[in-house]
Amino acid sequence: MSRICYLDCFSGVSGDMLLGAFLDAGVEVAALEAGLAALHLDDLILRTKRVEDCGLSAIKVDVDSSRRQNLRTLPDLLRILQESDLSSLVQERAALVFTAIASAEAKVHGTSLEQVHFHEIGALDTIADVVGVVLCLELLQIDQLVCSPLPQPRGFIDCAHGRIPLPAPAVCEILRGVPSYGVALEQELVTPTGAALVKALVGAFGQFPPMQQLAVGYGAGSQRLANGQPNLLRIFVGTPDDVLEEQQVEVIETNLDDWNPESYPYLCERLFEHGALDVSLAPIQMKKGRPGFCLQVIAGREDSAQLKDIVLLETTALGLRFRFEYRRTLPRRELHIESPWGTMRVKEVQRGGRRVIIPEYEECRRVAGEYDLPLQEVYGRIQGLNFYE
């Protein structure tokens, strides 16, 4: 059964907070310990306890790491994963998280991936947090992970390298492209481990996704927040609601008054080739009464940077506006049906519990041309084939 999990990071995110939340949502401690035993790290011992913060019950996770620990490099950690008895999927996901932290630390400290030594990532508690969270996804059979935007604090903290600003430089590197917002707190809210888990494992960011809720879990952090709010992370686990699909998109806009609109079809072609979800051009009246156009491009998070470059290259725009929005779409698929003119490609959407056939313009245009028929007649015949359940 497909399952979805939403991370509600109202007070930030760390590895131990995520791990505690998954345990509170139903992961058995014994099952998690059995999975971590596959790492063959004898000193790794989990300590869990139920705590209360602002009247809310949560699970706090600690790793018994009283023994002196050696600093580890990324190759050391990857070797531990490869020599473990973990499933290949858990190994791959954990490796992505460790590599995300290593890449950020190497960038910040001006060294290579192989040479960077981890003061945090090489410790047993961080290894347990990373591998433990990935194991929890497997144990709960979660295949979709959605996360709220992350809060970013201000101020300074002390670390092994000295006094550094918040957000920590490594966190800033890891969270490139991840939605976030500023808060007035002068305490660390997003740790490098938490940031890397989110960056490597989360598939989408935004509001609470449609789901049939099965469980809620709270994981506790290690500090008390100065503003009095609970230092907790909340997760929701459920089954996806197939009625609506929700995702975060980036809306890119620019106003143009000196651009030749004859180039618009070519621009659309380039934008769609590079992943644009939609492109539109609307007439507007600009300053001094000039007629102009507002070009709007809707993009997925992973394609937005390249699409912005294309707009600046192919138009006379001197700048762009962009913002994050959310969109809901009906579930849809492409299929082939039998028509009076042979097999035709159409769209099928789920609308109000019914399946509805929508004609494809290019297919209808092809048939109209081949059979010398009015385009609207072909459209009407295909729409007449609609069936409802």
From Swiss-Prot:
Pfam families in alphabetical order: Ni_insertion
Going by the UniProt record, its keywords in alphabetical order are:
Nickel
Tell whether Coiled coil is among the UniProt keywords.
no
Transferase listed as a keyword: no
Q: Which GO terms describe its molecular function?
A: lyase activity; nickel cation binding
Tell me the domain of life: Bacteria
Q: Which PANTHER family match?
A: NICKEL INSERTION PROTEIN-RELATED, PYRIDINIUM-3,5-BISTHIOCARBOXYLIC ACID MONONUCLEOTIDE NICKEL INSERTION PROTEIN
- Its family? Belongs to the LarC family.
Classification via NCBIfam families: nickel pincer cofactor biosynthesis protein LarC
**Protein name per its UniProtKB record:** Putative nickel insertion protein
